[in-house]
Amino acid sequence: MPILSLSSTRNSVLTRIYDYLKALVQQVIVPNVEDDKSSKSTPFEKLEPAKQNHPQKDCCATEKDDLVDVSELFPKQNNKQLSLTSKSSVVPCALNLDNLETPFSIKIDNNGAVTTQLNLDEPILRGPSRGEPAKLQNDLISSPPLEESYINNDQYKALFPSNFLPITPVSSVITPASKKSIDESPLSDEVQGIADESSETLPYICHYCDARFRIRGYLTRHIKKHAKRKAYHCPFFDNSISQELRCHTSGGFSRRDTYKTHLKSRHFTYPEGVKPQDRNKSPGVCTQCGEHFSTSESWVENHIEAGSCKGLPEGYSEGIREKKKTSKMKMIKTSDGQTRFISSDESVSEPALQNKNCIEATVMQSKERPNDKIIPTKTEKNDFGIGTQWFERKQISRPTQTTQSRGPTEVQNLKEWSIISPPILSPQNASSVPQEYQSSRYTLHMDSPALSSASSALSPLSGDPITTTETNKSYPLDSEQSLLEPDKTEEDAINQSKESNMISINEMLQKQMDFELLGENHLKETQDYLALYKKAYGIEF
């Protein structure tokens, strides 16, 4: 009895183990009955359907990623940003040399020879051709429409306002916002001078180049560009030593900040190991006298500019005080009603002497200065046009001589005397400031009374003054005085000198603006460039 019970228990345990293993095998390996009926296939062919039905999982994927559909690498439809092409002001470059209208055209014949021609008779059209605006408009209209949500976006409204127009050379440069920023910018002197010279909002005029400015400080800084002698000069600059040992090339500076930077870097000694960016807060020693200072800024203001340094040259402190009194700008109104601002003597240059208003304003200022010692009287040739020479005025003492009535022989010799007209002054080798402008002492006394027949004979000596026996007055023989016009006034002589000078300047400018000559020069330069291009690259046009 016990033996039978044990055998039955063993059979039942084995049966259960077999059923468990069978169920486990069925779960791991799923048999396909139809595969047995079909034709035999390789093991690799059997694995392909299994791979398609059971794709491999990404080991880095999470449960959150499984919920989102993963898109392909390249989408089926183009999802480009439509805002880049819709209502865009940027037009693709489509330069057509055949339709390009320029004042200078180049043609190439069958033999490869290049011929050039100036289009002087044809008007130059600036901008797009006739059919181009309509084409651009059609391109903008035919652009794909944008979504309404994108159009209502604040960023889109800021980029493309309602009154949007394509960019033009004027609208892209000058806008209400950009004009305001240009007016307030302290770094654009040239823009300030170019913008709307006839506007009343630019009352400050440069008396050298007629540039206008809205703020007086801009004009003061602009005038320094015309200066021959800079506003600031290094007191330790020595021109006698060699160029390699000098602290600066010229020692002159137009701006105070560059002047102070030069002093701090070349004439102030810092401790070892101090970086350049930390020098403003670092102490140091004066190179000239050896005195110690907490900062370089205090050394410049309290030691150098105050004149307390022992190494400064003699008279440096007095020169600074005198400069503060005399270097301020002064407002002068000219005869045509314009307001001119004259600065110190450091801001005189050659172009100023060719300006009528500048001449008048300079003369008015020179007459009002208390210590009227120096005035520009002559200019030298300079490529940059700022080479004014300064000369001290010297009083010329002319002895007053009287002449008696001359005999018939002297009168006959006087008639044969050749009268030489004053030469035409050129803007390079002659002064545009006439001699009578230099001082009231040198004005022409041309208001002569009617000469009698006995006293009408003039002295043949050009150096002798003209006198009469009735009035006993002396008339100097200046270049503006003509022997045949004794009743000529001082104003007529001044106008004659100005007109002769302006005529020569106008003739010179007219020669420079000769279009045929400019075209020939342009043609020659183009031919040289084509020859060089052909030689370098071996390409013929």
Swiss-Prot record:
I as annotated region, ranges: 13-32
Protein topology in the membrane: Peripheral membrane protein
Main location: membrane
Annotated Polar residues bias: 465-482
PTM note: Activated by the amino acid-induced proteolytic removal of an N-terminal inhibitory domain by serine protease SSY5, an intrinsic component of the SPS-sensor. Processing requires at least 2 components of the SCF(GRR1) ubiquitin ligase complex, namely the F-box protein GRR1 and the E2 enzyme CDC34, but does not depend on the proteasome. Processing is negatively regulated by the protein phosphatase 2A regulatory subunit RTS1.
PROSITE patterns: ZINC_FINGER_C2H2_1 (PS00028), ZINC_FINGER_C2H2_2 (PS50157)
Keywords: Cell membrane, DNA-binding, Membrane, Metal-binding, Nucleus, Repeat, Zinc, Zinc-finger, Zymogen
Record's subcellular location: Cell membrane; Nucleus
Function field: Transcription factor involved in the regulation of gene expression in response to extracellular amino acid levels. Synthesized as latent cytoplasmic precursor, which, upon a signal initiated by the plasma membrane SPS (SSY1-PTR3-SSY5) amino acid sensor system, becomes proteolytically activated and relocates to the nucleus, where it induces the expression of SPS-sensor-regulated genes, including the amino-acid permeases BAP2 and BAP3. Binding to promoters is facilitated by DAL81.
Subunit structure and binding partners: Interacts (via Region II) with SSY5; protease component of the SPS-sensor.
Domain writeup: The N-terminal inhibitory domain contains conserved sequence elements important for cytoplasmic retention (Region I) and proteolytic processing (Region II) of the protein. Region I is also required for ASI1/2/3-mediated negative regulation of transcription.
Remaining remarks: Present with 6490 molecules/cell in log phase SD medium.
The protein, known as: Transcription factor STP2
